[in-house]
């Protein structure tokens, strides 16, 4: 009877370890998505800064989608349209758009840090469970 309880406990610990490892994998993938989004936002920010400084009168190709672009000329580089969520677009200056981007980057960095802390916490729990599991294993006979 005691052996059954020990086996069940071992299985419970193994299930808990698998659960934590699955969560860690998911959280790491979310950190990757956040990193890609931050990279994209930083690229947009740098592009806005460049266009504000040197964009007036420049001819550019405007992407339409599916690898198709159209030639256009920048008349007022300080007039941008920005998505504020739920498909709502508003006019903004480059400075306003860049400020919005910086706020989004900061929020994403805060979320990234929280996810990394959770990964660290879950990893610590897995290590504790592995130690507990190792202590429960019978000594190997030679």
UniProtKB/Swiss-Prot annotation:
Transmembrane segment boundaries: none
Query: What Pfam families has UniProt attached to this entry?
Result: Prefoldin
SUPFAM superfamilies cross-referenced by the UniProt entry: Prefoldin (SSF46579)
Swiss-Prot/TrEMBL keywords: Chaperone, Cytoplasm
For the keyword Cytoplasm, the answer is yes
Q: Which GO terms describe its biological process?
A: protein folding
One CC-aspect GO term = prefoldin complex
Q: Which domain of life is it from?
A: Archaea
> Which InterPro entries does this entry report, sorted A to Z?
PFD_alpha_archaea, Prefoldin, Prefoldin_subunit_alpha
Subcellular location(s): the record lists: Cytoplasm
Q: What is its main location?
A: cytoplasm
Q: Which GO terms describe its molecular function?
A: unfolded protein binding
Asked whether the UniProt record includes Phosphoprotein among its keywords, one would answer: no
Oligomeric state and partners?
Heterohexamer of two alpha and four beta subunits.
> Could you say which protein family the record assigns here?
Belongs to the prefoldin subunit alpha family.
Q: What does this protein do?
A: Molecular chaperone capable of stabilizing a range of proteins. Seems to fulfill an ATP-independent, HSP70-like function in archaeal de novo protein folding.
Instruction: Spell out the protein name for this chain.
Output: Prefoldin subunit alpha 2
Q: Which organism is it from?
A: Thermococcus kodakarensis (strain ATCC BAA-918 / JCM 12380 / KOD1)
Gene that produces this protein: pfdA2
């Amino acid at each position: 009877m005691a052996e059954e309880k020990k086996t069940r406990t071992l299985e419970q610990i193994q299930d808990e370890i698998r659960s934590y490892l699955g969560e860690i994998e998911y959280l790491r993938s979310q950190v990757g998505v956040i990193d890609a989004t931050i990279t994209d936002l930083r690229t947009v920010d740098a592009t806005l800064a460049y266009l504000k400084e040197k964009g007036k009168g420049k001819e550019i190709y405007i992407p339409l989608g599916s690898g198709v672009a159209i030639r256009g000329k920048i008349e007022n580089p300080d007039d941008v349209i920005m998505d504020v969520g739920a498909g709502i677009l508003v006019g903004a200056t480059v400075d306003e758009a860049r400020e919005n981007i910086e706020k989004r980057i900061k929020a994403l960095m805060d979320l990234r840090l929280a996810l990394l802390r959770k990964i660290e916490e879950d990893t610590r729990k897995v290590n504790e469970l592995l130690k507990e599991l190792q202590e429960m294993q019978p000594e190997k006979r030679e």
